[in-house]
C-alpha cells in the first residue's frame, strides 16, 4: 500500500516536471539537465516501487537507449543538413528519460506524437506571428522549442 502511494507520487512528480520543462523551454529555449535527470530518476523509482510490473529492467533501459539514441541520430542528421544546431541535447535527454518511463514501444509512440504536437505548435506560432508577404521564405528562421511537443507526446 505504501509503495503504491510513492509510485503515484513519482507519477505526479513526472507530470509536474514535464510541465516545468515545457514552460522553461518556451521561455528560454532550454531543458535543464537537473529536470531531465529527475524525470529519469522518478521513472526508475516508479518501476522499483511497482516491482517492475509495467516494464522490466531491460525494457526501461532499452527505452532510454532508443529514445535518446533516435533523437540524437535525428539531431546529427538535421545538424549536418542545416549546418547549425537544430534539436538541443536537452531534447535528447528528455526522450531518454521518457524511455525509462515508457519502454521501447512507448517511447517510439511518444516521439511520433511529440513530433506531431510540435508540428501543430509550429504552425500555430507561424499563424500567430502573422507572417507578412515580405517575410515569406523566412519561416526557417523561426526557432520553435521541441520540448513542449515532446512533453505532450510523453503524456
What does each of the following model-derived ranges do?
Residues 1-155:
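A membrane-topology feature that recognizes alpha-helical transmembrane segments
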Amino acid at each position: 500500500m505504501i509503495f503504491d502511494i510513492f509510485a503515484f507520487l513519482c507519477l505526479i512528480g513526472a507530470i509536474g516536471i514535464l510541465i516545468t520543462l515545457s514552460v522553461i523551454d518556451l521561455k528560454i529555449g532550454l531543458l535543464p539537465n537537473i529536470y531531465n535527470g529527475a524525470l529519469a530518476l522518478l521513472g526508475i523509482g516508479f518501476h522499483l516501487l511497482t516491482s517492475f510490473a509495467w516494464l522490466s529492467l531491460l525494457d526501461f533501459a532499452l527505452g532510454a537507449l532508443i529514445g535518446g539514441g533516435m533523437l540524437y541520430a535525428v539531431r546529427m542528421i538535421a545538424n549536418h543538413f542545416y549546418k547549425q544546431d537544430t534539436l538541443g541535447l536537452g531534447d535528447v535527454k528528455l526522450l531518454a528519460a521518457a524511455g525509462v518511463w515508457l519502454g521501447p514501444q512507448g517511447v517510439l509512440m511518444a516521439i511520433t506524437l511529440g513530433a506531431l504536437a510540435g508540428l501543430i505548435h509550429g504552425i500555430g506560432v507561424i499563424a500567430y506571428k502573422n507572417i507578412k508577404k515580405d517575410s515569406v521564405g523566412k519561416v526557417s528562421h523561426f526557432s520553435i522549442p521541441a520540448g513542449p511537443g515532446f512533453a505532450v507526446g510523453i503524456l
